[in-house]
Curated annotation (Swiss-Prot):
Matches recorded under Pfam families: Serpin
Leader sequence residues: none
InterPro entries xrefs: Serpin_dom, Serpin_fam, Serpin_sf, Serpin_sf_1, Serpin_sf_2
Keywords, sorted A to Z: Protease inhibitor, Serine protease inhibitor
Protein family (similarity comment): Belongs to the serpin family. Poxviruses subfamily.
MF GO annotations: serine-type endopeptidase inhibitor activity
Keyword Nucleotide-binding: no
Official protein name in the record: Uncharacterized serpin-like protein FPV251
SUPFAM superfamilies: Serpins
Length: 148
């Protein structure tokens, strides 16, 4: 199961404050694990959006030291062909968020006996960072910024 997490900087108008706070994997893991977070019921107005990206990964892999993947004869064990190599490698990512595809857009109603519960309203009408994470492994799968 996947979950969508939206992060917004309430202290400034810049999304860079959120990006700066996620400068290491520990902070992302805390967010995914719900550590140091309070569960609160809200009414969320989240814009529908669809983002698509197509990235050439060859330069990134070479920069990380994986240059042998792109040389002939370096993929022995995968095929009998001695000249097998990776010519190019690309990653295409698409994320679509709408009222049908995200739990974050739903509102849970609850009844209380001690009066009317005031539920905060949050309108995501400013830039925000989002991540999609696997609930079981707590691994972020997609990370992006919505700028409207």
């Amino acid at each position: 199961m996947l979950k969508l997490i939206c992060l917004r900087n309430f202290n400034t108008f810049s999304i860079l404050g959120v990006v700066d706070s996620l400068n290491n994997g520990k902070n992302i893991n805390k967010i995914i694990s719900k550590k140091d977070m309070t569960l609160k019921e809200i009414v969320l107005y989240l814009p529908k959006f669809e983002l698509e990206d197509d990235v050439d990964l060859k330069d990134a892999l070479i920069h990380m030291g994986c240059n042998d993947l792109f040389k002939s004869g370096e993929l022995v064990g995968i095929s009998d062909t001695k000249t097998l190599r990776i010519g190019n490698i690309r990653q295409k990512s698409v994320i679509k968020v709408d009222e049908y595809g995200t739990e974050a857009a739903s509102v849970t109603e609850s009844c209380t006996t001690d009066g009317i519960k005031k539920i905060p309203i949050v309108k995501a009408n400013v830039p925000f960072m989002f991540l999609v994470a696997d609930v079981q492994t707590k691994i972020p799968l997609f990370l992006g910024i919505f700028q409207g």
